[in-house]
């Protein structure tokens, strides 16, 4: 029986010793970390904005608008702050020099007190964050084909172009078609399409030959006669 009691007392003593040790180890990282102590003392996040920043002394307009802004906000609770600032600026310009003079005197007094309290003060305005412009352009595949429609004589005709050169030629063709009366629209479109295919496939003769065999050139029937026929 005494052996059992002694073992129980030993276990209780060990647990009592372990509990404070666990508590100390759990709080030691917080007390030993200088960053956490700095945040607790300053009440900020450790950056410059968390430190005590010295404010500029108020000028005459700020001294005058301090009470006027509160009055306008109470009279017009729905008015935004930007609108209140515009109204106060307009009212300040309408004041005479005699009406402004007491506020200039108060501003000079505040500036003198500020110089005595902060003799090494230097005004350092905050830099505005510049917006990041993304100059990244989406890559256009060379094999991608864009289709558009040409409106000629109140009819829509599909047209295909592959690159910027073809697009520029296509825009010139649209100007020509819109300025002049269209004559044989189908013939013009086929010739333009055949020209763009031949220019886009200029670097590969095998592919060009395949396209030429698949799409033979278009010859008007009026110009084709027996004298123009070729017999091998």
Curated annotation (Swiss-Prot):
Residues 54-122 bind DNA. Keywords: Activator, Calmodulin-binding, Cytoplasm, Differentiation, DNA-binding, Nucleus, Sexual differentiation, Transcription, Transcription regulation. Pfam families: HMG_box. One of its GO terms (biological process) is sex differentiation. SMART domains: HMG (SM00398). Residues 24-53 are annotated as: Disordered. One of its GO terms (cellular component) is cytoplasm. It is found in: Nucleus speckle; Cytoplasm; Nucleus. It comes from the Eukaryota. PROSITE patterns: HMG_BOX_2 (PS50118). Transmembrane segments: none annotated. One of its GO terms (molecular function) is DNA-binding transcription activator activity, RNA polymerase II-specific. InterPro entries: HMG_box_dom, HMG_box_dom_sf, SRY, SRY-related_HMG-box_TF-like. Transcriptional regulator that controls a genetic switch in male development. It is necessary and sufficient for initiating male sex determination by directing the development of supporting cell precursors (pre-Sertoli cells) as Sertoli rather than granulosa cells. Involved in different aspects of gene regulation including promoter activation or repression. Binds to the DNA consensus sequence 5'-[AT]AACAA[AT]-3'. SRY HMG box recognizes DNA by partial intercalation in the minor groove and promotes DNA bending. Also involved in pre-mRNA splicing. PANTHER family: SEX-DETERMINING REGION Y PROTEIN (PTHR10270:SF161), SOX TRANSCRIPTION FACTOR (PTHR10270). Interacts with CALM, EP300, HDAC3, KPNB1, ZNF208 isoform KRAB-O, PARP1, SLC9A3R2 and WT1. The interaction with EP300 modulates its DNA-binding activity. The interaction with KPNB1 is sensitive to dissociation by Ran in the GTP-bound form. Interaction with PARP1 impaired its DNA-binding activity. Belongs to the SRY family. This is Sex-determining region Y protein. The lineage of its organism: Eukaryota, Metazoa, Chordata, Craniata, Vertebrata.
């Amino acid at each position: 029986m005494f052996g059992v009691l002694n073992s129980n007392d030993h276990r209780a003593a060990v647990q009592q010793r372990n509990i404070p040790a666990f508590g100390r180890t759990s709080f030691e990282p917080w007390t030993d970390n200088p960053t956490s102590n700095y945040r607790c003392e300053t009440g900020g996040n450790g950056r410059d904005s968390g430190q005590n920043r010295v404010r500029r002394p108020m000028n005459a307009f700020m001294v005058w608008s301090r009470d006027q802004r509160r009055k306008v906000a109470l009279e017009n609770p729905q008015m935004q702050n930007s609108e209140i600032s515009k109204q106060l600026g307009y009212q300040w310009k309408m004041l005479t020099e005699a009406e402004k003079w007491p506020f200039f005197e108060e501003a000079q007094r505040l500036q003198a007190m500020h110089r005595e309290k902060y003799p090494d003060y230097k005004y350092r305005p905050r830099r505005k964050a510049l917006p990041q412009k993304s100059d990244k352009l989406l890559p256009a595949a060379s094999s991608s084909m864009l289709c558009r429609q040409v409106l000629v004589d109140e009819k829509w005709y599909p047209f295909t172009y592959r690159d910027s050169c073809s697009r520029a030629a296509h825009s010139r063709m649209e100007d020509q078609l819109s300025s002049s009366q269209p004559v044989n629209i189908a013939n013009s479109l086929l010739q333009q399409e055949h020209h763009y295919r031949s220019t886009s496939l200029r670097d590969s003769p095998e592919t060009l030959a395949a396209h030429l065999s698949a799409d033979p050139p278009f010859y008007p029937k009026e110009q084709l006669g027996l004298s123009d026929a070729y017999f091998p």
